[in-house]
UniProtKB/Swiss-Prot annotation:
<feature type="binding site">
    <location>
        <position position="546"/>
    </location>
    <ligand>
        <name>L-isoleucyl-5'-AMP</name>
    </ligand>
</feature>
<dbReference type="InterPro" id="IPR013155">
    <property type="entry name" value="M/V/L/I-tRNA-synth_anticd-bd"/>
</dbReference>
<comment type="function">
    <text>Catalyzes the attachment of isoleucine to tRNA(Ile). As IleRS can inadvertently accommodate and process structurally similar amino acids such as valine, to avoid such errors it has two additional distinct tRNA(Ile)-dependent editing activities. One activity is designated as 'pretransfer' editing and involves the hydrolysis of activated Val-AMP. The other activity is designated 'posttransfer' editing and involves deacylation of mischarged Val-tRNA(Ile).</text>
</comment>
<feature type="binding site">
    <location>
        <position position="870"/>
    </location>
    <ligand>
        <name>Zn(2+)</name>
    </ligand>
</feature>
<dbReference type="InterPro" id="IPR009080">
    <property type="entry name" value="tRNAsynth_Ia_anticodon-bd"/>
</dbReference>
<keyword id="KW-0862">Zinc</keyword>
<dbReference type="Pfam" id="PF00133">
    <property type="entry name" value="tRNA-synt_1"/>
</dbReference>
<dbReference type="InterPro" id="IPR023585">
    <property type="entry name" value="Ile-tRNA-ligase_type1"/>
</dbReference>
<feature type="binding site">
    <location>
        <position position="873"/>
    </location>
    <ligand>
        <name>Zn(2+)</name>
    </ligand>
</feature>
<dbReference type="InterPro" id="IPR033708">
    <property type="entry name" value="Anticodon_Ile_BEm"/>
</dbReference>
<dbReference type="InterPro" id="IPR009008">
    <property type="entry name" value="Val/Leu/Ile-tRNA-synth_edit"/>
</dbReference>
<feature type="binding site">
    <location>
        <position position="859"/>
    </location>
    <ligand>
        <name>Zn(2+)</name>
    </ligand>
</feature>
<dbReference type="GO" id="GO:0005829">
    <property type="term" value="C:cytosol"/>
</dbReference>
<feature type="short sequence motif" description="'KMSKS' region">
    <location>
        <begin position="587"/>
        <end position="591"/>
    </location>
</feature>
<dbReference type="GO" id="GO:0002161">
    <property type="term" value="F:aminoacyl-tRNA deacylase activity"/>
</dbReference>
<dbReference type="Pfam" id="PF08264">
    <property type="entry name" value="Anticodon_1"/>
</dbReference>
<keyword id="KW-0547">Nucleotide-binding</keyword>
Length: 886
């Protein structure tokens, strides 16, 4: 008989489950399949009465294409939702979009110029809606388990009305107030900014030591003595109205040359080096309180200002004497109020100086540093000038520097609700305790929330001013009336109608006016727990999951708003992920030139490999993107796919039936139960990288050991042999486990695999299946087999030596003389497990026996003597030869 006859007699099947994935084609095919069959909707109907699990989607900003961070975020959420859904929970996933704010407004203004507020708002609204549609189309390519017809967006009348209901609640609780305070001000945006809208970037500032002349002295200082002042913002010297000292700090009056100077004693040596003072003389020592009330001459204008006490004075840097410009610094402001200092505002909204700047009026604040320095130089008031590079606040949208600037603004008091916030944080589950501390620091230690913005595209602050220009906050019926109008017409009504048209009849024609400011956009997204319609579900929701920057953003505003409205956190658990960085650890972005388009990645690799990269990342840290890392995930995917293909192919003739297992088959079945348990535990902990690693490691071990030893049974035994069916039962068990296990991560591949699985009560989609439950794992059985693997390792070391010396080609050519006293080892089929020709037991050392036995041409195993083929193959062939000859 020829070789082809033997080959054709083996149990070798073909499969339509291809080795090549063709993911790009299959992504579209299965996405269409899921949409056509309304799989998401069917899942929700099926799970409707089950326990709920709600992951609330934080809304991305509706501007521009999605970036790799968007894709990472949505996929991580989708993995959780898919797993929870398969685990039996009712878990609707409702995507949202944040639509108001400066980027869109600026884009529209650049397109149409400075038109009316109504026109800017109309165009901004249209643009935001178009961007939602564009981003939605891109998000669909990520194979998310959701219905993009059921979304929420912050510019709908219903959402806006609910947002204003929450604002009304804040007002009714006495939390909203208006005050003149220095706040972050962005000249580039011409608006106030909250802390959440600040990004710290490197910036070069002047480091200037100048002097102020004392006008009238006392027992410690004299007229014309010079106060040494340090500043990095010379432009604020125009608004100077006082100098602060530390009451209990020690100060010195020193003489250098012809001049007398005053500075902190602890900083004298340091400054003497900077000023190159070689021969100074200490004239007197005194505490800071000794010169309180002393007057000095303003460095620029002809006016007199006082020395006052300041708790913020530090001896770390500077001179121990701090220049105060009360409308340009928070500490300055409070000290100015306490001491009735003059409040000078010389900077307009656009950052240019007004008439209060005298000869410098019309200058942009940053450009004036040079001019003011030159002015002081001419008056011989500069002791030292250098430049420092330091971290400086910038507008997170325009990336331009911001300043502290005193303007009348609206605030929400955080001080009044701090205890409530602390209590709410205690109820939140965090994966790590340091994350709890981070949120606490961001929320509880923050200043009062600045909620007003001087822009057009946003939700209006629905506040009226009476004829005396006082805000009307004590008329709830006015708020209710406006909210009803917004619910019907949208927030545009505030700008379309006159003040009287917006008021209930009894408050009309009283000479009232309306507020022009809008609410902080973080207020918009921060009410989504209440304003978004998530399948009629109410907070607290199970998880909020966003980038780590949201501790000061969405996590923060959502918590504050929910505590004010409901009295509890809107989320039970908080998860966060890092940023996507390149191979060098640099954050990826278009502006840095290292950004990567996720749509191009999807086109090249397919969605499942992209999702595998996400799952296989330690997302709680920054996530590295590189071609090399993607190729590693391609290799993992290939291993999974090839293993699945082997399983499917070798189950072609298997009908799902349970078989009693023994020996190694029982050991492997037990291992599969452990695999199931570990997968469940890590999905429950949202440790997807561990899920991937566990699956990958199992496949490697399974292939290297079990598949190696059972291929002979699968291919060469009778089709219906019990041994073969026992092996197939394990293959079937593993195939089902892998299919379900990868479904949350790789939905396309899981769906394709499912189409090849035979089972009773099969669903229309794998994603409608139930996730497997935890199973009993026999630790004693598992431990018992450790003894075998120790023997296997030692035997194979000896066999490898024979192969390296070219005495043999394969392990199945040799015999093993094995030293062992173990009853367990003697009870198992070592010939099969070690894949050798024979095994004998010995009292001496373990040896490899070189045999010159005959090779069976059908199964390629070696035997002492065969009659054309081995006995097993002869028995198989004796049944199929008549079939071949018929």
């Amino acid at each position: 008989m020829d070789k082809n006859f033997y080959k054709n007699s083996l149990n070798i099947f073909n499969s339509n489950f291809s080795m090549k994935a063709n993911l790009s084609e299959k992504d579209k095919f299965y996405a269409d399949f899921w949409e056509k069959n309304q799989i998401y909707q069917q899942i929700l109907r099926k799970r409707r009465g089950n326990p709920r699990f709600i992951l609330h989607d934080g809304p991305p900003y509706a501007n521009g294409d999605i970036h790799i961070g968007h894709a990472l975020n949505k996929i991580l959420k989708d993995i959780i939702v898919r797993y929870k859904t398969m685990a039996g929970f009712y878990s609707p996933f409702v995507p949202g979009w944040d639509t108001h704010g400066l980027p869109i407004e600026n884009k529209i203004i650049n397109q149409i110029g400075s038109k009316s507020t109504l026109e800017i708002r109309r165009k901004s609204n249209d643009f935001a809606n178009s961007q939602i549609l564009a981003q939605m189309k891109q998000f669909k390519k990520l194979n998310l388990l959701t219905d993009f017809k059921q979304i929420y967006q912050t510019n709908t009348p219903n959402y806006e009305a609910k947002q204003l209901k929450l604002f009304k609640k804040m007002v009714s609780r006495g939390l909203v107030y208006r005050a003149l305070k220095p706040v972050y001000w962005s000249p580039s945006s011409q608006s106030a900014l909250a802390e959440a809208e600040i990004e710290y970037l490197e910036y070069r500032s002047p480091s200037l030591f100048t002097s102020f002349d004392i006008k009238k002295g006392n027992n410690f200082v004299a007229e014309n003595d010079k106060l040494i002042i340090w500043t990095t913002t010379p432009w604020t010297l125009i608004a100077n109205s006082g100098v602060a000292v530390g009451e209990n700090f020690d100060y010195v009056r020193i003489k250098n040359g012809e001049n007398f100077y005053v500075l902190a004693a602890n900083l004298l040596e340091k400054l003497a080096v900077i000023f190159d003072w070689k021969h100074y003389e200490i004239i007197d020592n005194f505490p800071g309180r000794a010169i309180l009330g002393i007057k000095y001459l303003h460095p620029i204008f002809e006016k007199i200002c006082p020395i006052v006490s300041g708790n913020h004075v530090s001896l770390d840097v500077g001179s121990g004497l701090v220049h105060l410009a009360p409308l340009f610094g928070e500490d300055d402001y409070w000290i100015g109020r306490e001491n009735n200092l003059e409040m000078v505002m010389h900077v307009n909204d656009d950052g240019k100086f007004n008439e209060n700047a005298g000869q410098f009026s019309g200058q942009f604040y940053a450009d004036s540093n040079k001019l003011i320095t030159e002015f002081l130089e001419k008056k011989s008031k500069i002791l030292h000038l250098s430049f420092i590079d330091h971290s400086f606040p910038h507008d997170w949208r325009t990336l331009k520097p911001v300043i502290y600037r005193g303007t009348p603004q609206w605030f929400v008091s955080i001080e009044k609700i701090k205890k409530d916030l602390e209590k709410a944080i205690e109820e939140i589950e965090f994966p790590e305790n340091w994350l709890k501390k981070r949120l606490t620091k961001m929320v509880v230690e923050r200043k009062d929330w600045l909620i007003s913005r001087q822009r057009s595209w946003g939700i209006p602050l629905i506040i009226f001013y009476d004829q005396n220009k006082d805000p009307v906050l004590d008329k709830p019926e006015i708020f209710d009336y406006i909210i009803s109008l917004v619910e019907k017409f949208g927030s545009r009504i505030w700008y379309e109608k006159t003040t009287d048209e917006l008021l209930p009849e009894k408050y009309q024609n009283l000479g009232w006016t309306k507020e022009n400011d809008i609410l902080d956009v973080w207020f918009d997204s921060g009410v989504s727990f209440f304003a978004a319609n998530i399948s009629d579900e109410k907070p607290p929701f199970d998880i909020y999951f966003e980038g780590s920057d949201q501790y000061r953003g969405w996590f923060n505003s959502s918590l504050i708003n929910s505590v004010i409205y409901f009295g509890f956190s809107p989320y039970k658990k908080l998860l966060s992920h890092g940023f996507v960085v390149d191979a060098k650890g640099n954050k990826m972005s278009k502006s840095r030139g290292n950004g990567v388009d996720p749509l191009l990645i999807l086109s090249k690799y397919g969605c499942d490999i992209f999702r595998l990269w996400v799952a296989n990342s330690e997302y709680y840290n920054d996530i590295v993107y590189s071609e090399a890392i993607f190729e590693q995930n391609v290799e993992i995917y290939r291993k999974i796919r090839n293993t699945v293909r082997f399983l499917i192919t070798n189950l072609a003739d298997f009908k799902p039936t349970k078989y009693e297992l023994t020996e190694v088959d029982l050991y492997i079945f037990n291992k599969i139960q452990k695999l199931k348990n570990e997968i469940i535990q890590n999905y429950d902990q949202n440790r997807f990288v561990r899920v991937v690693k566990i699956i990958n490691n199992f496949i490697i071990e399974f292939s290297n050991f079990y598949l190696s030893i059972v291929k002979d049974i699968l291919y060469a035994d009778k089709k219906e042999s019990l041994k073969r069916r026992q092996v197939q039962y394990n293959l079937y068990e593993l195939l089902q486990v892998l299919n379900i296990a990868i479904a949350p991560i790789m939905p396309t591949t899981a769906e394709e695999i499912y189409s090849f699985i035979q089972k009773n009560n099969k669903q229309i989609s794998v994603h409608m299946e139930e996730f497997f439950k935890e199973s009993h794992f026999d630790e004693e059985l598992d431990a018992k087999w450790n003894e075998f693997f120790q023997i296997k390792d030692s035997v194979y070391q000896l066999i490898e030596q024979k192969i390296k010396s070219k005495e043999i080609k394969r392990p199945n050519e040799v015999g093993v003389l094995l030293k062992t006293d173990s009853d367990f080892i003697k009870s198992i089929d070592l010939k099969k497990l070690l894949m050798v020709a024979k095994v004998e037991f010995s009292n001496g050392k373990t040896e490899i026996l070189q045999l010159n036995w005959e090779k069976c041409p059908r199964c390629w195993n070696h035997f002492e003597k065969i009659n054309k083929v081995c006995a097993r193959c002869f028995e198989v062939l004796s049944e199929i030869v008549p079939e071949k000859n018929s």
